[in-house]
């Protein structure tokens, strides 16, 4: 009796096989396939619903490849039907913009007990050329900046690939950025045909609408963020337009560097679509009311179109027109691949760059998203650290002073430069209360009483200083210093009227003011209620024409124009001059103030 050939099944109690020695092993039905041991696994590239992708190297040829392990979700299902469809379709397609399968691998299961052979299944791998990047990785990488010519190059290749697929009577049904790969030469390839199907009907032609639509298919296709509105509303007899909607989403994503329609549910996805392209109506999509999920149309009743305003800063009018044609609600009015390829967007400057002219991008895949996210955060932190803070301008009256605990006043709405703090020369001087803002345009001279002794120094007040006059009155002075306006009289002849004026200064004995002769007249000369009534400084009485004791000393560089400080209200026009005036070191060392000190000594000697 002849011994039966080895088969995958085992007959343990068959009487006809008792006299034969049977070797329990499966029949080698995959003898032409490669083995996994022929490849060296380098790293994992990604994982999806239908498989795990790994980067590997052929040990013999040293060629880099991508191994896609086909996942069996249940041991009873056998070979995945999606993988069978993908392999069958890819064997019929041959285009430079479509990813090929160059080999298949079957890895036998490791069986310790021969009785478990029926319950153990091997693993299948598809072998395809290694692609250094995918579109998600390029857009997530902060080191890569895509120019318009680069985007046109990618879009042109993508449209050529999808046009070839539609011509061969296939629907891809899963167009998204993660399924668009780019090799080292800049060639774009469409991958992942696990959801692809043959469609029935005429193929699309130029300006003739989509192809297909003669047969019903499942609606559970296309990733939600790239799913067209007809699928969201329950259309089963869809056309090649479902792929063109996904290409429109990818086109917008190339500019925004992130998905443009990120819905959490199908209803939310429909709302985002209506917010972008406008709600469906009798003009934009007349057949929408006949779809099974037409109740979702109520979501778009309050939506307004925002596509032009959202993408106007990112692309030119031709690009917006192409995007609008690809994202048209009505699938029979939507651009097909031939319509898009003949659009003016690809004919105007800048022209699409050739694939071999594209820059050599670094390797980046979807699995690198977290690494790129950390890199972007690091760059943003460095940018914020080096960012120069902007000046704060008040938004309303009184905001500037209120933010600094100052009460509202006539200068409350003007942000001005802060004056320099005065320098102190001895321990007897106390720090003056210097306001944080002043304004020359709203300055009103402080009214003074003309009675004798009314202008004597008063006690320090806790009220904030809000004018130049109060600043001059309350600021610290060096001991024996008198601040005053220059007199038109000769500086060598110090009269009682000119020397008796003590404007904003301090006297060693304030009681002498009662005995001063003609004090009222002297006060009236220098202290008036109007700026126009103040006497103009006499050029002959400047610091260059004072007594001989001041001419002998050589003026310092910062004292060359000290005469400009004689008329405070006329000369101080901006914050720089204000800072110069409040530089107390320069002010007290000026020749004119030395002259005032000399006059004070003569006054004290005369009335002491």
Swiss-Prot record:
The keyword Thylakoid does not apply. SUPFAM superfamilies: Protein kinase-like (PK-like). It is found in: Nucleus. GO terms for molecular function: ATP binding; cyclin-dependent protein serine/threonine kinase activity; protein serine kinase activity; RNA polymerase II CTD heptapeptide repeat kinase activity. It is an enzyme of class 2 (transferase). One of its GO terms (biological process) is filamentous growth. It catalyses: L-seryl-[protein] + ATP = O-phospho-L-seryl-[protein] + ADP + H(+); L-threonyl-[protein] + ATP = O-phospho-L-threonyl-[protein] + ADP + H(+); [DNA-directed RNA polymerase] + ATP = phospho-[DNA-directed RNA polymerase] + ADP + H(+). Residues 400-411, 487-502 have a biased composition (Low complexity). This is Serine/threonine-protein kinase BUR1. It comes from Debaryomyces hansenii (strain ATCC 36239 / CBS 767 / BCRC 21394 / JCM 1990 / NBRC 0083 / IGC 2968).
């Amino acid at each position: 009796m002849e011994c039966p050939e080895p088969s995958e099944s085992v007959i343990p109690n068959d009487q006809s096989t008792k006299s034969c020695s049977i070797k329990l092993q499966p029949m080698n039905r995959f003898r032409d396939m490669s083995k996994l041991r022929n490849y060296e696994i380098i790293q994992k590239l990604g994982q999806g619903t239908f498989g795990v992708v790994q980067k590997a190297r052929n040990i013999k040829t040293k060629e880099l490849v991508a191994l896609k392990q086909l996942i069996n979700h249940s041991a009873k299902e056998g070979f995945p039907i999606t993988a069978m469809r993908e392999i069958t379709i890819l064997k019929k397609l041959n285009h430079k913009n479509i990813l090929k399968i160059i080999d298949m691998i079957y890895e036998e299961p490791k069986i310790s007990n021969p009785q478990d052979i029926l319950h153990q299944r091997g693993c299948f791998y598809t072998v395809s050329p290694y692609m250094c990047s995918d579109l998600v990785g390029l857009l997530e990488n902060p080191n890569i900046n895509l120019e318009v010519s680069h985007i046109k190059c990618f879009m042109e290749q993508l449209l050529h690939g999808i046009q070839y697929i539609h011509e061969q009577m296939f629907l891809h049904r899963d167009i998204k950025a993660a399924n668009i790969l780019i090799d080292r030469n800049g060639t774009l390839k469409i991958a992942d045909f696990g959801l692809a199907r043959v469609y029935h009907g005429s193929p699309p032609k130029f300006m003739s609408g989509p192809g297909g639509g003669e047969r019903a298919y499942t609606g559970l296709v296309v990733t939600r963020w790239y799913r067209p509105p007809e699928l969201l509303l329950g259309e089963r007899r869809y056309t090649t337009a479902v792929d063109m909607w996904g290409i429109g989403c990818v086109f917008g994503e190339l500019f925004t560097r992130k998905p443009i329609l990120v819905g959490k549910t199908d209803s939310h996805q429909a709302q985002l679509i209506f917010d972008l392209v406008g709600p469906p109506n009798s003009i934009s999509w007349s057949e929408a009311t006949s779809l099974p999920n037409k109740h979702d149309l109520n979501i778009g009743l309050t939506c307004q179109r925002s596509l032009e305003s959202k993408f106007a800063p990112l692309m030119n009018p031709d690009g917006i027109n192409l995007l609008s044609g690809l994202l048209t609600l009505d699938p029979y009015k939507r651009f097909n691949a031939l319509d898009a390829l003949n659009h003016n967007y690809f004919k105007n400057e800048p022209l699409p760059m050739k694939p071999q002219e594209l820059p050599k991008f670094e390797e980046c895949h979807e699995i690198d998203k977290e690494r790129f996210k950390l890199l972007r955060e690091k760059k943003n932190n460095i940018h914020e650290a080096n960012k120069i803070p902007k000046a704060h301008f008040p938004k309303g009256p009184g905001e500037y002073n209120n933010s600094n605990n100052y009460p509202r006043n006539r200068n409350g709405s003007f942000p001005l430069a802060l004056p320099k703090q005065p320098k102190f020369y001895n321990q007897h001087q106390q720090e003056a209360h210097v306001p944080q803002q002043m304004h020359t345009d709203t300055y009103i001279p402080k009214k003074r009483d003309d009675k004798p002794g009314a202008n004597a120094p008063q006690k320090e007040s806790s009220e904030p200083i809000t004018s130049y006059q109060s600043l001059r009155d309350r600021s610290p002075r060096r001991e024996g210093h008198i601040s005053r306006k220059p007199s038109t009289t000769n500086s060598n002849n110090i009269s009682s009227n000119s020397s008796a004026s003590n404007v904003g200064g301090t006297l060693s004995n304030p009681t002498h003011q009662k005995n001063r002769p003609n004090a009222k007249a002297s006060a009236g000369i220098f202290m008036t209620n109007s700026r126009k009534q103040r006497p103009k400084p006499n050029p002959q009485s400047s610091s260059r024409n004072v007594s001989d004791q001041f001419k002998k000393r050589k003026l310092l560089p910062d004292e060359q124009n000290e005469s400009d400080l004689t008329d405070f209200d006329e000369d101080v026009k901006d914050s720089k001059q204000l800072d110069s005036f409040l530089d107390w070191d320069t002010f007290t060392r000026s020749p004119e103030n030395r002259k005032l000190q000399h006059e004070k000594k003569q006054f004290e000697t005369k009335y002491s």
